[in-house]
């Protein structure tokens, strides 16, 4: 009896579950961890990079991408599903610009993606998208935005959030450490994102993909060397803090 609801996308189980949507959410939990942090004048995206094969080109393995000049997205889950969503979102951004002669707002394109995902939970012959996304950018008012969508088609605005395999651990870290002082400068916001990922990434900066977006500026991707410099700086700060603690205890 239960298997009937298990296989059907558009049929609720007697206790109110859409199992295929829940399975899509499980697919997200198996994806790489991604974190987004809204700073004062910046939005930071960081993603845990999985190890790349020796002969593979790293540039083809990206979990952060631009949707328009002022909007970008990071995702966790199935890369092939994400590619479809990204292409549809990019077309919508260009179509909106041609139609109304204004760029999309961050909330508009987030709502478009969420609506697309919701349609795939309610029609036969399709399955839900197995991705969650962090969508960030700036509107004309210059205020940084951060939204998160999930496979069910819901979306919410956040100050900071994480998705993917270790999202719970990273979110708990952000709840403890996200303060006005922690995002007072662009540099501090970047370091907070890296610190959050280092909670679950064991091999340091080489396995972190990092990007920032500022108002009226395109998406900036950080090189592995740049990320490593930040990691080194964070480690030095930790060592100094530990030394101060040990001196106080003595």
Curated annotation (Swiss-Prot):
In terms of Pfam families, this protein maps to:
Proteasome (PF00227), Proteasome_A_N (PF10584)
Q: Where is the signal peptide?
A: none
Among PROSITE patterns, the record links this protein to: PROTEASOME_ALPHA_1, PROTEASOME_ALPHA_2
User: Which SMART domains does the UniProt entry name for this protein?
Assistant: Proteasome_A_N
| Classification via InterPro entries | Ntn_hydrolases_N, Proteasome_alpha, Proteasome_alpha-type, Proteasome_asu_N, Proteasome_sua/b
What the entry lists under NCBIfam families is as follows:
PRK03996.1
Q: What is this protein called?
A: Proteasome subunit alpha type-7-like
Which organism was this protein described from?
Answer: Macaca fascicularis
């Amino acid at each position: 009896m239960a298997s009937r609801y298990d296989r059907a996308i558009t049929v609720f189980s007697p206790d109110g579950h859409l199992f295929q949507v829940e399975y899509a959410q499980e697919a997200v939990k198996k994806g790489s961890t991604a974190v987004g942090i809204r700073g004062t004048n910046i939005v930071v995206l960081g993603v845990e990079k999985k190890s790349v094969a020796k002969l593979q080109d790293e540039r083809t393995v990206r979990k952060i991408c631009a949707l328009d000049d002022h909007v970008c997205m990071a995702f966790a889950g199935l890369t092939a599903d994400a590619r479809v969503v990204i292409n549809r979102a990019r077309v919508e951004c260009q179509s909106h610009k041609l139609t109304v002669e204004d760029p999309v707002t961050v909330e508009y394109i987030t709502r478009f993606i969420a609506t697309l995902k919701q349609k795939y939970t309610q029609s036969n012959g399709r399955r839900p998208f197995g991705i969650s996304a962090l969508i960030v950018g700036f509107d004309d008012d210059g205020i940084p935005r951060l939204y998160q969508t999930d496979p069910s088609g819901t979306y919410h605005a956040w100050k900071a959030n994480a998705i993917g395999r270790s999202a719970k651990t990273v979110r708990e870290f952000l709840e403890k450490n996200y303060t006005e002082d922690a995002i007072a400068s662009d540099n501090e916001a970047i370091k907070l994102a890296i610190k959050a990922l280092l909670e679950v990434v064991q091999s340091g900066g080489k396995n972190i993909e990092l990007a920032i977006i500022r108002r009226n500026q395109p998406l900036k991707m950080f090189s592995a060397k740049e990320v490593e410099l930040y990691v080194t700086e964070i480690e030095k700060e930790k060592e100094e803090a530990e030394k101060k603690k040990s001196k106080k205890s003595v």
